[in-house]
From Swiss-Prot:
GO terms for molecular function: translation elongation factor activity. Pathway: Protein biosynthesis; polypeptide chain elongation. The gene is efp. InterPro entries: Elong-fact-P_C, NA-bd_OB-fold, Rib_uL2_dom2, Transl_elong_fac_P/YeiP, Transl_elong_KOW-like, Transl_elong_P/YeiP_cen, Transl_elong_P/YeiP_CS, Transl_elongation_fac_P. It is found in: Cytoplasm. Belongs to the elongation factor P family. This is Elongation factor P. It comes from Mycobacterium ulcerans (strain Agy99).
């Protein structure tokens, strides 16, 4: 059990037998009336996001989630195989569980896998990851039909928008949460 004062992003709650992760929360103290906590919760299995409000100080049921450091090894059909960094056990995870993170997975990449009662729930990539651009069109300085960006294909096959000065072969820092360009990596 946890109080609303213990809320933090990533905390997993058990509500009506389902697991929900806190995406956002905000303590609100209105001028009139009692304080409350406004939350945005994401269903761990389905990915559905809902808004829920709790009175301040209310106790809620939390779920024990074990986050383990793993390394992504390879793809086997529709499964992604991860190796636990402590006991070297391999965990094949289905494509549905990996979700959108699959477009940023590179062999040998460190990844956290969350487990509940021994069953894998979801994976967490590092926030910033580095990739090599395998293909992008040359950017012309006078070409301003777009907002100064162009599409680029990364070594994983994912496509992101990058500034015009990026060339094929450049190494980039990318935000794994939204696929946003963060900068070039200096060699």
């Amino acid at each position: 059990m946890a109080s609303t004062a213990d809320f933090k992003n990533g905390l997993v709650l058990q509500i009506d037998g389902q697991l929900w992760s806190i995406v956002e929360f905000q303590h609100v103290k209105p001028g009139k009336g009692p304080a409350f906590v406004r939350t945005k919760l994401k269903n761990v299995l389905s990915g559905k996001v809902v808004d829920k409000t709790y009175n301040a100080g209310v106790k809620v049921e939390t779920a024990t989630v074990d986050r383990r450091d793993t390394t992504y090894l390879y793809r086997d059909g529709s499964d992604f195989v991860f190796m636990d960094s402590q006991d070297y056990e391999q965990h094949p995870l289905p494509e549905s569980l990996v979700g959108d993170a699959a477009r940023f997975l590179l062999e040998g990449m460190p990844v956290q896998v969350a487990f509940h009662d021994g069953a894998p729930l979801y994976i967490e990539l590092p926030v910033t990851v580095e990739f090599v651009v395998t293909h992008t069109e040359p950017g012309l300085q006078g070409d301003r039909s777009s907002a100064g960006t162009k599409p680029a294909t990364l070594e994983t096959g994912a496509q992101i928008n990058v500034p015009l000065f990026i060339n094929t072969g450049d190494k980039l820092k990318v935000d794994s949460r939204d696929g946003g360009y963060l900068g070039r990596v200096n060699a």
